[in-house]
Amino acid sequence: MKTPSPNLVATLMLAGALAATVRARAQAWGLPELSKESKACLECHKQDNTGVYQQWGASKHHRANVACFECHMANEGEPDAFLHEGYRIATIVSPKDCARCHSKEAEEFANSHHSKGARILGSLDNTLAEVVEGNRGMKTPGFPGGVSAAAVSGCWQCHGSEVKVLANGKLDPATWPNTGIGRINPDGSEGSCSACHSRHSFSAEQARHPDNCGKCHMGPDHPQMEIYYESKHGIAFRAFKDKLNMDSSKWVVGEDYNLAPTCATCHMSATPARPANKDRPALPAQPVTHDVGMRISWNNRPEISVRPEISDKKLGLPGAEVNWQTRRNHMKAVCVNCHEQQWVDNFYVQYDSLIDLYHQKFAEPGLELYKLAKPLMNPVQFANKLDWTWYELWHHEGRRARHGASMMGPDYTHWHGTYEVAKHFYSKMVPELEELVQKGRASGDPAKVAAAEALAKKLDEVLNQANHNWYLNKMDPAEKAERERRQQEFQKRYAK
């Protein structure tokens, strides 16, 4: 690059002018022309990074004359700022940088659970990746004592790393590259816009595609992508994805497309105003939102599902003031563009009933039993069979059941969900609890004997409840007789 170095004042003036131009709407969108700084960047990078240059060239940023320097510019004193060919820049473009033009989106994102994704230290998931699966074998300047490669290449790539800037200005290789949704950036901001808006094309069509979300929302513990593709929504998307106008600037369900929803449709995208009818009041239009929790009415992440305003309060988010009923109405305003009101209302009855079943039959008694078993167990996490059984029961199988019901995935609700929960509750957890009771009673330790008696009493109480008494062969005789009659009829129809 041969362009002379701009001084700090010029850099600050450019940043201010860019933000002011956008805020004041001096023109429809973008800048009047490419800045001389970005032109200088492009002289080299169109040769050195052809793919980056071509992606940007096909993007709306290119059409808006927003280029390298407008995004990568940095101020003196920023932790990751460095001089490059006379320009002060930063490698990482953080949400704070994107907010120069996209302030509304950045604020909504900052108020979402997505931006807090890296706050996983201390979780059982993190213990698994760092200790049980991992070791301290990956040593870097930022982690001289070592860090787990399983955490670096696994958890952190979705949840986000805490990016460390080294003494020489470079970024620690354990923490970068990283586009995790909750990445903690050197400028103090949380999140990564490029988790969804992949650089350097920043395609709305790609961000709206279900596979974009599926990078993280998949697998045994949160298989939203697999559930979506099993559902009628996913089937419709595969059939009609070329007819959904997914590259449209304005993308309003019921106006710009109607043949299928994507994840973005339900959780983020705009909805039109709808007049009142006999089943509901008038619905105002909803704008696009980057707070993906504003339309969900259950947080299904923990052992026992909680209402989203409760988890928002724990994170100190403004959503603590938005109750689940309001959020559900926001989601229903999406649904009614393709479904009539009774269909929508009845779906939520089904969904809530599955949550209640999971809670009442397995999660609530299971959690209480697990806590009572703790004094009889090795205190080291995941050093006991029961640790693994209980963890997978709620973290994998229990989530699959709940997520399956939330997105109309029957196989994930039943066979991958409640079936697995029940199988492991009765065939693993109950026998493991009984074994702990037996060992505790025989230990000779008064504290363990007392703990064993308390656990035995609770287990007996749980198994004698109506939800579980079939296990003790105590099912109501009339119901038992009726089920035997149905089984006989089934055998007559299908037995050879």
Task: Give residue spans per PLM region.
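Bacterial N-terminal signal peptides
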Residues: 10-19
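Short sequence/structural segments immediately N-terminal
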Residues: 25-496
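Bacterial N-terminal signal peptides that target proteins for export
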Residues: 1-11
